[in-house]
Amino acid sequence: MEHLLKLSSLTPDEIIHILDVADEYKRLHKAGTDPKDLQGKAIALMFGKHSTRTRTSLEVGIYQMGGLGTYLSAADMQIARGEPIQDTARVLGRYYDAIVYRTFKQSDVDALARYSGVPVVSGMTDYAHPLQVLTDLMTVREYKGKLAGLKAGFVGDGYNMANSLIVGCLMMGMDFTIACPNGYRPSADVLFFAREYGDHFKLTTAPDEAARGADVLFTDVWTSMGMERETERRRRDFNGFCLDAARMALAKPDCIVQHPLLSLIHISEPTRLRRIS
């Protein structure tokens, strides 16, 4: 039994295999022949955070592959009343063949995987967003024809998206430069991981450095879910850390831009026209 809790738990070959399978499933879907690999399987979608794209893509994808996806709002479950995560995990594991869990604490996803007895996939935590980044890598490869050797830049908050992008891009042989203000660096263990890649990774406070010569640029929200009280301070701290026409001019002419949305003020309107969302 395997879980997908963070990208660093995978090998580069495993990531490539996932992308290859996803490409084939996409081809089959366009041809009108969805594979039914989940026929007779029940998947729990346990969400403790708001979601539009993650929930929608999972529910539709599970349905197209013949499975049953059950949306479970954590706010409506006994876990909201203090039930230990291990008890919830054991119960869900008896009914479902796999569980996707979207929540705040990475430790809660880890605990669910430890006690459920079925495969667990992270639908996002405050530490990582592996599904989003696998999809990002799939999109980059589709538009660029490859991953290895590309230059990727990230401008914004060194939070969950940045953590997973650093790991995923470096494992795929890409150069990665992240620009974030002081006090908003990626997690210490992710930076330790990135050091193994030497000059292929750079951390800076200068957004233009991340954009210069980039094949693909990523950004993210400045205020993630659960941080709403910090909105005004973060707007001040991240002033200038956006993708606009001047910054895009530093990237390669065929650079693509990816944002997990909501995009709001992090990306200018002209840049939106070049975005692959």
Model-flagged regions — what are they?
Residues 265-277:
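Single conserved hydrophobic/aromatic residue that forms the stacking wall/gate
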Residues 171, 246-254:
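Short, conserved loop/helix-junction motifs that constitute active-site signature segments
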Residues 221-241:
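Glycine/threonine-rich flexible loop motifs
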Residues 90, 97-168, 259:
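Anion-binding alpha/beta catalytic cores of soluble intermediary-metabolism enzymes, centered on
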Residues 1-56, 60:
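Positively charged, low-complexity intrinsically disordered leader regions
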Residues 42, 47-95:
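Active-site cofactor/substrate anionic-group-binding motifs, chiefly glycine-
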Residues 48-60, 144-219:
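Glycine-rich phosphate/diphosphate-binding loop of Rossmann-like nucleotide-binding domains
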Residues 93, 113, 210-212, 248:
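A short, aliphatic-rich alpha-helical micro-motif
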